Curated annotation (Swiss-Prot):
Pfam families: WD40. It comes from the Eukaryota. Changing W185A: Reduces interaction with NVL. The modification N6-methyllysine is found at K311. Residues 323-345, 360-385 are annotated as: Disordered. This is WD repeat-containing protein 74. The gene is WDR74. InterPro entries: WD40/YVTN_repeat-like_dom_sf, WD40_repeat_dom_sf, WD40_rpt, WDR74/Nsa1. The modification Phosphoserine is found at S214, S361. Keywords: Methylation, Nucleus, Phosphoprotein, Repeat, WD repeat. GO terms for biological process: blastocyst formation; ribosomal large subunit biogenesis; RNA metabolic process; rRNA processing. It comes from Homo sapiens. Its main location: nucleus. WD repeats lie at residues 40-80, 83-122, 128-168, 179-220, 224-266, 267-306. It is found in: Nucleus, Nucleolus; Nucleus.
């Protein structure tokens, strides 16, 4: 049933335990998908992206450097490719013109033949984008253009069909009022639709807008939110504002035209790892270390629409962009079918049952001793009535 209903899932979430979770918000159901049966932490999901076929195909980037192809129509994994090179986890994943684009922590960006299953083949292109990468983001309007940034690694824009040098390299802001250098820590990047501008959020709670068409390479707009590192960011449907999340579970909407705070969203209890707005509906999906997927309404009245506890720490998510969320057909339920137990809770229930049996066997002896003591009190000759 999970495979048959996979196409109707609204949100896909990658977990720290290596499980891909599909969540249907209308039915309030979550299904687990794994390539090898049992989940392994060595296969923790660190990146997700849609394939070139739209939302029928998904690419799943894992900690063991494999990129798995998942069919959302059939609910099954359809192969994988090992992408070696560099160190660390995937910080970005993309697909363009039959090629696969990967980028890891150590700053190695590689382009691969997407259909090539030979793991020993060399990449088509390799770029060194600088160490400490936190995010690689593809330009939706130009799939061969990507942006990178990280800790002490300033924002850069790369044309994968051009030279091996960045087409834009951001310049750090001027020294602060103490004439001290301002550190760099770009955590997330987004391309603004209909323009060449980009927006970044930083580990020092800054939101910055860059314009490569401008003569200056410094930000054309900068604002701050809160006191804690910003970890994730997404564009709102209109493209005039962004929603950012930080390490304390705080969410806020920032206007990119004036740099002011438009409002906040409540409910999160842990560091935010993934954010995505629906392209046409006023909905925001968020996930993080508190293991809960939340769907907020971002237009007045703001508030929490859905909340699903998913048992594992959540690293990333993809939100379906379809509009017919409420129009999906109701598939018939199979009679007398026993649901499969969740692999994440098998060991927990087994340990609880064993503990209960030990406790029950230990209680049998004290109960017998208690009855003996009560009988002794009622022997003949006792002064008790």
């Amino acid at each position: 049933m999970a495979a048959a209903a996979a196409r109707w899932n609204h949100v896909w979430v990658g977990t720290e335990t290596g499980i891909l979770k599909g969540v249907n918000l209308q039915r309030k159901q979550a299904a687990n998908f794994t390539a090898g049966g049992q989940p392994r932490r060595e296969e923790a999901v660190s990146a997700l992206c849609w394939g070139t076929g739209g939302e029928t195909q998904m690419l799943v980037g894992c900690a063991d450097r494999t990129v798995k192809h998942f069919s959302t129509e059939d609910g099954i994994f359809q192969g994988q490719r090992h992408c070696p090179g560099g160190e660390g986890m995937f910080r970005g994943l993309a697909q363009a013109d039959g090629t696969l684009i990967t980028c890891v922590d150590s700053g190695i960006l590689r382009v691969w033949h997407d259909k090539d299953k030979d793991t020993s083949s060399d990449p088509l292109l390799e770029l060194r984008v600088g160490p400490g990468v936190c995010r690689m983001r593809q330009d939706p309007a130009h799939p061969h253009v990507v942006a990178t940034g990280g800790k002490e690694n300033a924002l850069k824009i790369w044309d994968l069909q051009g030279s091996e040098e960045p087409v834009f390299r951001a310049k750090n802001v001027r020294n602060d009022w103490l004439d001290l250098r301002v550190p760099i820590w770009d955590q997330d990047i987004q391309f603004l639709p209909g323009s060449q501008k980009l927006v970044t959020c930083t580990g020092y709670h800054q939101v910055r807008v860059y314009d490569p068409a401008s003569p200056q390479r410094r930000p054309v707009l900068e604002t701050t939110y809160g006191e804690y590192p910003l970890t994730a960011m997404t564009l709102t449907p209109g493209g005039n504002s962004v929603i950012v999340g930080n390490t304390h579970g705080q969410l806020a909407e920032i206007d990119l035209r004036q740099g002011r705070l438009l409002g906040c969203l409540k409910g999160l209890a842990g560091s935010v790892r993934g954010l995505q707005c629906h392209p046409s509906k006023p909905l925001l999906a968020s996930c993080g270390l508190d293991r809960v997927l939340r769907i907020h309404r971002i237009q007045n009245p703001r508030g929490l629409e859905h909340k699903v506890y998913l048992k594992s720490q959540l690293n990333c998510l993809l939100l379906s962009g379809r509009d017919n969320w409420e129009d999906e057909p109701q598939e018939p339920q199979e009679p007398n079918k026993v649901p499969l137990e969740d692999t994440e809770t098998d060991e927990l229930w087994a340990s609880l049952e064993a503990a209960a049996k030990r406790k029950l066997s230990g209680l049998e002896q004290p109960q017998g001793a208690l009855q003996t003591r009560r009988r002794k009190k009622k022997r003949p000759g006792s002064t008790s009535p």
